[in-house]
C-alpha cells in the first residue's frame, strides 16, 4: 500500500481537491397540463391524469412502464 513520505501542505491539498468539480445537470423545460416542469432529458417522465394520479412512465414519447 502506498503511503506518502511527507505531510501534504494545506495549499497543495486544496489545490488538488479543487479539481473535483460537480457539473450542473442539463434540465429540459416541458409543459404538461399547463404546468411547467424541469426534468433530466434522459429519464422517463411520469404521465398523470387531470386529477394528478400517476398513470405510466413515458420516455421519448413511448410508454415504457406502468406505475
From Swiss-Prot:
The keyword Ribonucleoprotein is assigned to this record: yes
Example GO molecular function: structural constituent of ribosome
One GO BP: translation
Residue stretches spanning the membrane: none
Record InterPro entries: Ribosomal_bL32, Ribosomal_zn-bd
UniProt keyword list: Ribonucleoprotein, Ribosomal protein
Positions with biased composition (Basic residues): 1-19
One cellular component (GO) term of this entry: large ribosomal subunit
UniProt KW Ribosomal protein keyword: yes
Region feature (Disordered): 1-21
Stretches assigned to coiled coil: none
Superkingdom assignment: Bacteria
SUPFAM superfamilies linked to this entry: Zn-binding ribosomal proteins
Family: Belongs to the bacterial ribosomal protein bL32 family.
Family matches, as NCBIfam families: rpmF_bact
HAMAP family assigned to the protein according to its UniProt record, in alphabetical order: Ribosomal_bL32
Name of the featured protein: Large ribosomal subunit protein bL32
